[in-house]
Regions:
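Amphipathic alpha-helical coiled-coil segments
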Residues: 1-70, 77-88
């Protein structure tokens, strides 16, 4: 019984740590997405004013797409961490 209790505490600690890490990843991904969107807006404006090239716009679009993908992956990791945490606390 003592071994099982120690194991549950270790699992709870790991799940709590993972949950905190993934929540931070979501916050960071949100910030990066906002920055990528702002950059895309600025580059698009500059392009329309003749100050930036199409390559600059495409690069900004790619960065925005990557930021969105990273945000989705962060959300997924956070949901998985929450599921693991709930599993551990229900044991």
């Amino acid at each position: 019984v003592l071994f099982r209790s120690d194991n549950i505490l270790e699992e709870l600690s790991a799940a709590t740590t993972k949950l905190a890490e993934t929540e931070q990843q979501v916050r960071t991904a949100r910030e990066n997405t906002a920055l990528a969107e702002e950059n895309l807006d600025l580059v698009t404006f500059s392009y329309n004013e003749g100050k930036a090239s199409m390559v600059d716009v495409l690069s900004a679009q790619l960065s925005w797409t990557q930021a969105q993908t990273n945000l989705i992956n962060a959300y997924l990791a956070a949901k998985m961490a929450m599921a693991e945490y709930r599993k551990v606390i229900s044991e």
